[in-house]
Swiss-Prot record:
It comes from Bovine papillomavirus type 5. Its main location: host cell. GO terms for biological process: DNA-templated transcription; symbiont-mediated perturbation of host cell cycle G1/S transition checkpoint; symbiont-mediated suppression of host innate immune response; symbiont-mediated suppression of host type I interferon-mediated signaling pathway. A zinc finger (unnamed) spans 82-117. Homodimer. Homooligomer. Interacts with host RB1; this interaction induces dissociation of RB1-E2F1 complex thereby disrupting RB1 activity. Interacts with host EP300; this interaction represses EP300 transcriptional activity. Interacts with protein E2; this interaction inhibits E7 oncogenic activity. Interacts with host TMEM173/STING; this interaction impairs the ability of TMEM173/STING to sense cytosolic DNA and promote the production of type I interferon (IFN-alpha and IFN-beta). Residues 2-51 are annotated as: E7 terminal domain. A motif (Nuclear export signal) lies at residues 99-107. It comes from the Viruses. Gene3D superfamilies: 3.30.160.330. GO terms for molecular function: DNA binding; DNA-binding transcription factor activity; protein domain specific binding; zinc ion binding. Highly phosphorylated. This is Protein E7. Keywords: Activator, DNA-binding, Early protein, G1/S host cell cycle checkpoint dysregulation by virus, Host cytoplasm, Host nucleus, Host-virus interaction, Inhibition of host innate immune response by virus, Inhibition of host interferon signaling pathway by virus, Interferon antiviral system evasion, Metal-binding, Modulation of host cell cycle by virus, Oncogene, Transcription, Transcription regulation, Viral immunoevasion, Zinc, Zinc-finger.
């Protein structure tokens, strides 16, 4: 707070604001229970100019399965699908928290390619 010199002027008072009545209602939000297959089928990768990455590229729905090998060694087997439909099996050593983050990464704009698609699209 800043103290100034004593003043004998009084400023005019502002009029009171108009009264506002808020009516609040309880909102119910439905859970969005889309699985990985549905999200992957809806995903269409594009560049900033909205053109497809490769002509004829249309990812198919690919299931993502994560199975834990054992509680001791924290090895998980992850099965995802290449856009061509070929299943890819990956062994991942991770903590349960990190494997959840890996699953979220797989749900994002990330495609894992089989060796055939990788060599065909990107060379050897």
């Amino acid at each position: 707070m800043v103290a100034g010199p004593a003043c004998s002027k009084f400023l005019p008072q502002d009029p009171p604001p108009p009264s506002v009545t808020l009516v609040l209602h309880d909102l119910t939000q439905e859970e969005d229970e889309q699985d990985f297959v549905t999200l992957h089928a809806q995903y269409r990768p594009t560049f900033k100019d909205k053109t497809p990455r490769r002509p004829g590229y249309n990812p198919r729905a690919a299931p993502c399965h994560i199975q834990r090998l054992s509680a001791r060694c924290s090895v998980f087997f992850v099965q995802v699908g290449c856009p061509c439909g070929q299943p890819l099996k990956i062994a991942v050593q991770s903590t349960p928290d990190c494997i959840s983050q890996f699953e979220q990464l797989l749900r994002g704009p990330l495609d894992l390619l089989c060796p055939h698609c990788a060599s065909r699209c990107y060379g050897r």
